[in-house]
Regions:
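Dinucleotide-binding Rossmann-like beta1-alpha1 core, especially the glycine-rich loop
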Residues: 1-71
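Short glycine-/acidic-enriched loop or helix-start segments at secondary-structure transitions
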Residues: 9, 52, 191, 227-229, ...
Length: 371
């Protein structure tokens, strides 16, 4: 979406032949679908025959009348719930947005601000979906830079995943004489005369080290940055809001499997008839998994034995300290496997290997002191 960012990415990792160099970006097709009622739906929802068949006649009629009602009875956009209802109608909101949104944020959409919806789906609505369908049918669709985020069909991706981009940047910094310090927790940002003059970091041994600086760029969560500021009086209200900002934490389980039970039923040709999806949004209410990534489709170079195995990532949203966060690695992996077996995506005996990764403060939340 940003030409400046795209140019920077491709300056670091140009679009070269992946069979000749590792330092390259791949152009990938974005295929994201919704898994609901043990069936696949396009993401965003399309007006195809398969959608109506999978939805069923009664649900289809409810969705149609619900959308028409929402066109003439607009709700005040004081919440994410009203934001979605205004664009899709209540029945579609309840089918495809309500449960999943609560899964992601741990809060009902009626208690979330409309800001997140305006950023995530922006101008997306039933009308924009129909417009996109007609543009594709008549060959007048614009490039990805000028379409809604949820309608983008291609993206560029590092050969070995996003971590490779930052490993490459770190390598370039070192080659130019710079130093990249790992396992240093920033605990202080010292300011003099309205300028950051030094940063205090704590090492894994507990030692505190001071680094004088001319420039300071922060990617810290605001919740951690504001309390670390020294040398100026941060207004109490600002400090209080910053330290109480809510965040959503994240756990991902990686599974190496022989195969997936779900197969490709699209017109897209795939290896061994595997599903073409990069992301699958799991809308089923009887499991806690939120999204499923199929890494073979992000980059075939991510999977050592691409021909005979699939590498998938199960995404769970939680809060640090809750029962999911505190669950042992072994128990969590077993729960994740059981959930995919339950919804007929894999077989237990096909699991070859697994890993478990926790990520704190993965997403800032749009409620509480955010307002």
């Amino acid at each position: 979406k940003s030409e400046e960012v795209m140019n920077w990415w491709q300056n670091i990792m140009p679009m070269a032949d992946p069979d000749k160099t590792d330092r390259t970006m791949l152009t990938r097709n974005r295929v994201s679908r919704i898994f609901f009622l043990r069936k696949f739906f396009d993401y965003p929802i399309s007006m195809k025959k398969e959608t109506f068949v999978n939805m069923g006649f009664c649900n289809m009629m409810k969705a149609g009348f619900g959308y028409l009602w929402s066109c003439v009875h607009k709700l005040p956009e004081t919440s994410l719930e009203n934001f979605y209802i205004n664009r899709f109608g209540r029945p579609l909101y309840e089918m495809f947005f309500e449960g999943y949104t609560e899964k992601v944020w741990g809060v009902h959409p009626s208690k979330l601000g409309a800001d997140w919806g305006s950023q995530r789906v922006k101008g997306l609505s039933i009308l924009s979906v129909l417009k996109d369908m007609f543009q594709k049918a008549f060959g007048t669709k614009k490039d990805n830079q000028h379409v809604e985020t949820s309608l983008i069909e291609q993206f560029i991706y590092p050969k070995y995943g996003p971590g490779q981009l930052w490993e490459t940047v770190a390598s370039d910094v070192k080659q130019m004489g710079g130093e990249v310090l790992m396992q240093h927790e920033v605990i202080g940002v010292n300011i003099e005369d309205d300028k950051v003059v030094s940063v205090v970091a704590k090492t894994t041994t507990g030692e505190e080290v001071v680094f004088p600086c001319d420039y300071f760029f922060s990617t810290m969560p605001i919740k951690d940055l504001v309390p670390a500021i020294k040398g100026i009086d941060v207004p109490e209200q600002v400090r209080e809001i910053a330290t109480s900002l809510p965040y959503r934490d994240f756990i991902t389980v990686g599974l190496c499997v022989k195969e997936m039970q779900i197969k490709n039923q699209t017109a897209i040709q795939t290896y061994k008839n595997r599903v073409p999806d990069t992301w699958i949004y799991i809308q089923e209410r009887d499991v806690r998994i939120g999204r499923l990534q199929v890494f073979n489709n992000w980059s075939p170079y991510l999977v050592k034995d691409y021909e005979n195995t699939m590498w998938i990532g199960l995404e769970y949203f939680c809060t640090e300290g809750d029962k999911f966060w505190n669950m042992s690695k072994e128990d969590f992996i077993q729960m994740a496997i059981d959930e995919l077996v339950k919804i007929d995506i894999i077989r237990k005996e096909d699991v070859l290997d697994a890993c478990h990764v926790k990520i704190k403060k993965a997403y800032p939340s749009y409620y509480g002191s955010y307002y």
